[in-house]
Amino acid sequence: MTKNKVALLLGGLALLTACEQNKVTEISTEELLKNINNPTYLIVDTRHDSLYNGFKDQNATKGGHIKGAIQFTTAWLDYIADDKFESFAKDKGISKDKTIVFYDSNLDDLQRISTEFAAKGYKVKVFKDFINYANADYPLESFTNYQLSVSPQWLNAAIHGEKPETYTNDKLMVFEVSWGDLEKAKSYTQHIVGAYHFNTDWIENAPVWNLSTPKVIEQNLIKNGITKDKTIVLYSENQLAALRVLWALKWAGVEDVRFLNGGLTGWVDANLPTETQVNIPTPVASFGTTIPQYPEINLSMPDDVIKAQKENGLKLISNRSWDEYTGKISGYDYIPGKGEPDGAIWGFAGTDSSNLADYYDPDHTLRNPLEIIELWKQQGINKDDHLAFYCGTGWRASVPWFMTKMMGWKNTYVYDGGWNAWQMDSKYPVQKGAPNNMSKPDAHNDFGKIQKKGNSCKS
């Protein structure tokens, strides 16, 4: 026998031995309940965001996730670099000294993720009876306003005239959101069937890039068929655009406006149809109410922030990159000033002004709000605080604001003027550098950039 054959044989035996030592075993409902508060056990929901957040799984009478469960979606496996896998899992609380209990209603996904972790040396059990668990009188948790973030499957059902959970309307419009008129809207070249284009200029204007006047916004909305009583679903290639417009529509008075989590990529991955033809909305005569209906969610200019700080102790939360926050760069070629409003707290962000990477999962869906809340706690940002999120011009700030709305937090706002408005007048106090020379806080979200194929015992 050649040395190569011996090496291959020994390697195969080693892999078999590893898989034998890390067999995946099933856990019963009784055993799960017995260990639900056991610190040596970790329960992990591997389903898509909408199901974890609160939507009902197929054939389930209740929605949400098992009490105390964290989230690690099976689809993430395709986006986590091999050299980051264990550190990323550790950041989620998954370690080899714990018994990891995975559950999912999709047994193929459950097998994939459980064998992947077992092959890497984790102690793994699987819970295959989640639907019966959900239909029994066992504890489930969900987010207060989980319906704000919808899945491709939910939207597809609504488009086809069905009544998916929480949807009671018969008037639906879907918009791809990006800057520019149709001829400049590259993200609209391929879009969800029936979707329209929403130009972000319809709700904001230079030089501050704050919300336009109520009259201008009303004219743009009715010209594009948007009324207060229609269900509006928004998506964008860059999540910031859709969530910026969602905040603006909620400010205006649209009662049911939602975000397609995962955008067009998630839609295509779900094998749902797209088209290239241009759809033009039919104008309407009236928005249906006076704009704005919810002015309180907007702190427009620096003076509004200062007033709120004096009245209720408002905390100003920066969602600008660390280099912007510490005054190394302004972040924009049209914003000359560097620094932050005095007293601003860093609320995590992204690599530059175009993204909010700390808030995204490996598959580019929104990160679990519970993880973000834990990061905020380290920064002194808490549920009962009055919080105004801001960035340069309001786009990035819409993401954390949206998450607080999902969680049912009451006193959260977007400071629309952001750093751009603040730095325009030298009378407003500015801080530069990291407060107290603090180091950049860890977002615990480094999954690398290399796609992986998997390394499990599953054949």
Predicted regions mapped to residue ranges:
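Gram-negative bacterial Sec-dependent N-terminal signal peptides
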Residues: M1-E20
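Cytosolic catalytic domains that perform sulfur/thiol-centered chemistry
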Residues: C19-S459
